[in-house]
UniProtKB/Swiss-Prot annotation:
GO BP, sorted A to Z: DNA recombination; DNA repair
Subunit structure: Homotetramer. Forms an RuvA(8)-RuvB(12)-Holliday junction (HJ) complex. HJ DNA is sandwiched between 2 RuvA tetramers; dsDNA enters through RuvA and exits via RuvB. An RuvB hexamer assembles on each DNA strand where it exits the tetramer. Each RuvB hexamer is contacted by two RuvA subunits (via domain III) on 2 adjacent RuvB subunits; this complex drives branch migration. In the full resolvosome a probable DNA-RuvA(4)-RuvB(12)-RuvC(2) complex forms which resolves the HJ.
Region of interest (Domain I), ranges: 1-64
Species name: Haemophilus influenzae (strain 86-028NP)
Transmembrane segments: none
Protein's recorded name: Holliday junction branch migration complex subunit RuvA
Gene behind this protein: ruvA
Keywords: Cytoplasm, DNA damage, DNA recombination, DNA repair, DNA-binding
Gene Ontology cellular component list: cytoplasm; Holliday junction helicase complex; Holliday junction resolvase complex
Gene3D superfamilies: 5' to 3' exonuclease, C-terminal subdomain, DNA helicase RuvA subunit, C-terminal domain, Nucleic acid-binding proteins
NCBIfam families: ruvA (TIGR00084)
Entry similarity comment: Belongs to the RuvA family.
Residue ranges, annotated region (Domain III): 156-204
């Protein structure tokens, strides 16, 4: 199994990237919380990975931190949570935010994530509560301050908004809902990654 990849970032179109590892291009799906940490196109990056084998496809998921992958693996063990839903959960919340929501039994916050209904949220609480006791409350809701203004992504409002809407749809949001979320936060100076981040933050 592929557990870790180190290579040159060739393309990034949230939530997908193309990574060149010694001449081989790997397509990976990343949660947005990991996507924000990516370097500029053409630079080297290292990602922890998880391979999902299905009858119709092999899907490779990438994560900036090992803790993100660990939570992803815990999520897909939960009945009713597949890889795509786990990706949506990790895109909407950091590991710390998710842990905080679980420990405080914040069902309403979990059900705001696309694809997470009341029953799924209740299952997550039952199966994952108590697994995050080592995390301090002061660690929760830490703002990321290192999202670069990437010249590889159009900074024009229309282009950034279109890319952000496409990414949100890929994460499970309905087209009309994704468009509404983006319009609420879009600004001309923001990259698509920043628009996605602000839209997801505002949705919770």
């Amino acid at each position: 199994m592929i557990g870790r990849l180190q290579g040159i970032l060739l393309e990034k179109q949230p939530p997908e990237i193309l990574l060149n590892v010694q001449g081989v291009g790997y397509e990976l799906l990343l949660p947005m919380t990991s996507f924000y940490d990516l370097p500029e196109i053409g630079q080297e990056t290292t990602l922890f990975t998880h391979l999902v084998v299905r009858e119709d496809a092999h899907l490779l998921f990438g994560f900036a931190q090992k803790t993100d992958r660990t939570l992803f693996r815990e999520l897909i063990k939960t009945n009713g949570v597949g890889p795509k839903l786990a990706l949506a959960i990790l895109s909407a919340m950091s590991v710390e935010q998710f842990a905080y929501a679980i420990e405080r039994e914040e069902l309403s916050k979990l059900t705001k994530i696309p694809g997470v209904g009341k029953k799924t949220a209740e299952r997550l609480l039952v199966e994952l509560k108590g697994k995050f006791k080592g995390i301090k409350q002061s660690d929760f809701f830490v703002e990321s301050t290192h999202i670069p203004l990437s010249p590889s992504i159009e900074s024009h409002s229309e282009s950034s908004s279109d890319e952000a809407i496409s990414a949100l749809i890929a994460l499970g949001y309905k087209p009309a809902e994704a468009e509404k979320m983006v319009k609420r936060v879009a600004k001309p100076e923001l990259t698509s990654e920043q628009v996605i981040r602000e839209a997801l933050k505002a949705a919770l």
